[in-house]
A protein has these predicted regions:
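Conserved catalytic or regulatory cores that recognize and/or transform ribose-phosphate-containing ligands
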Residues: 1-96
Length: 96
């Protein structure tokens, strides 16, 4: 079973950017959980985050209150948080 990674995107990111992040995580062997799929529903985003094994923070995440909240909640729940560089340094190996 692959690790599920929540994609925390600041407002202003396009759907194309959101799905590019999703594709990148998939290529690394992760199962992406894309906050863009929730159409701005912050409660749905937080529910999605709590069901994940990690959080991908997009560039400039700290400028967006919801992305900052996602990082704080994840850290409180001991869910690993990192940039693309972090997750790409730890790709999922086959069979995980």
């Amino acid at each position: 079973m692959s690790q599920r990674i929540y994609i925390a995107l600041p407002s202003g990111y396009t759907r194309e950017t959101a799905y590019a992040a999703e594709d990148a995580l998939t290529l690394l062997g992760y199962e992406p959980a894309n906050s863009a799929d929730n159409n701005g529903d912050d409660r749905a985003n937080l529910r999605m985050l709590t069901q994940c094994d990690g959080v991908l923070l997009a560039p400039n995440w700290e400028t967006n209150p919801m992305s900052a909240l996602a990082a704080t909640v994840a850290q409180h729940l001991n869910i690993p948080v990192g940039s693309y560089d972090h997750w790409s340094a730890h790709p999922v190996e086959e069979g995980q």
